[in-house]
Amino acid sequence: LAKTDHLAILQFGLRHWLEWRSRSPGEYPDLSEAHLPNLNLRGANLSNTNLSKANLTGAMLLGANLKDAILSLATLSYAELTEADLTKANLVGSSFLHASLRGAELVGVNAIASDFSAAQLQNADLGEANLSGSELRKTNLRGVNLSHADLSRTNLLEAELAEANLYKANLSQANLREAHLTGVYLLGANLSFSSLEGTDFRWSNLSKVNFQGANLSRANLRGANLTKADLTGVNLQGTIMPDGTIHP
């Protein structure tokens, strides 16, 4: 079917779309550049769908299947994606500003240079995700799985990461100033040359973390585990150390 036919089927109604997809398992829908703001796509099967440059602002995608979908340069600001499945989706350059992705599956997504600022991602699974160069300012990432994820050069200013799993994550050159990382599991993570001024690491597992060249001034490390952490060239001015003392 032509691209215009795919869009017509979707606009005819969600039930019609779901029936068509079940009858056409080999079809790869093309909805690129489609204008779909505020559309109700709850539980929709959008797997392997091309939604590049689509406008899905405020769309209802709760529980939707977006596995292997192409959402590069798409706009999903204020969209509802709670418990949606975006496994291995292409999100390069996309905008999820203020979107809700609570409990969503985002394993292995390619989200280079995307914008998740002020989004809600509590308990989402972002294992092995590539978020390099992305905006995550004031994003709620409480309890998320980011193990083995690439967060290099990301902006996580004032982000909420309490109780997150960042096992062996790459956060080199990331901006985590004033971010909250209490009770976080960072074993073997790379935080080299990152900005960590005023970051809250209380009671976190920071063992074997690479902090080379990082700025930890005014950070709070009270109760943190720094066993075998690499602190070469680190700025610890005014940092609260694990025992509660303040570094000169």
Give the label of every model feature segment:
Residues L1-A2:
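Terminal targeting and flexible regions in eukaryotic proteins, enriched
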Residues L7-A8, H16, R21-P248:
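Tandem repeat scaffolds
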